[in-house]
Amino acid sequence: MCFCVIKVPSCIIYFTNLKVLQLCGIIFNIDASPRIHLPVLKKFDTKNCSWLNAHDDVTIDAPLLESVLIEQDRNSVFRKPRSCQIKFSASCIKEFTYRSLGGISQPIVLSNSSAARNASVNIILNKDGCESYVQETESCAFILLKQFREVKCIKFDASEVLTQPNVAILPKFAMLSHLELGCVSDVVLLRLLQKSSVLNTVLFKVPRLSKFNQELLNSAVVPDCLTSTLQVVKFENVRGSKHELFLAKYFMENGMVLERMSFSCVSWCNKDLIEEFKEKLYSFKNGVSFAILEFRF
């Protein structure tokens, strides 16, 4: 269903045989808090949809739900009144993706964090030329991320929206083994590592720090994952910058069980700069790390 306005009745709604729900460009006008029962739904997929109500929320009751994909463009993110909270009541989510241009203006909650225990989580936020994200992004991103404390894989390409106070009160990610990050500050990176004690793989899609304090990272207590579980560190879109060099050096010096570190360089990067970058890395590696260094151009 695409591009229309639907008035949602204030009652319990049943779709007893629906297994796949795909909606595009729908504006739902809501008078009260509807509860939508979808007993056999497996896939919930919406693009540029808005659930307009200033006070109430929408509950999606789908016990068999496996896949959630929510995509928003700038118009749907900045639309007023803001979209109300969506609550998923499910028990076996395997894949959750939220992708938007402009941030998050819509709180998304799970009735039970264990519902996503086996999920792969992908959260991607882009500014799309905007000077800043929509105002609610910081709080909504925090609410969304903290609910996935039991998952094994998180891809979070929106790390710059997290603040130090928010990261400090995030729960521990006791099962997290794979973490992918976009641009991130030194403090946020350190806190995420400290809260992920069994982390096996870290991938930096944009390997630079939005805030750079070498003394802070060097003086902080080394996260447990670096001394016991972290085996693979990957850097994508490498340009040979000092931030990338420092991050690599930090992991080589502190990664006691590190086995492999890979670098995927941008195609247009100066070859001489990359060769200099490689030489410095190998000089750090000598006597410090037994990890294999890999380069792709």
Residue spans for each PLM region:
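Leucine-rich repeat
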Residues: 1-172, 177-192, 200, 204-220, ...
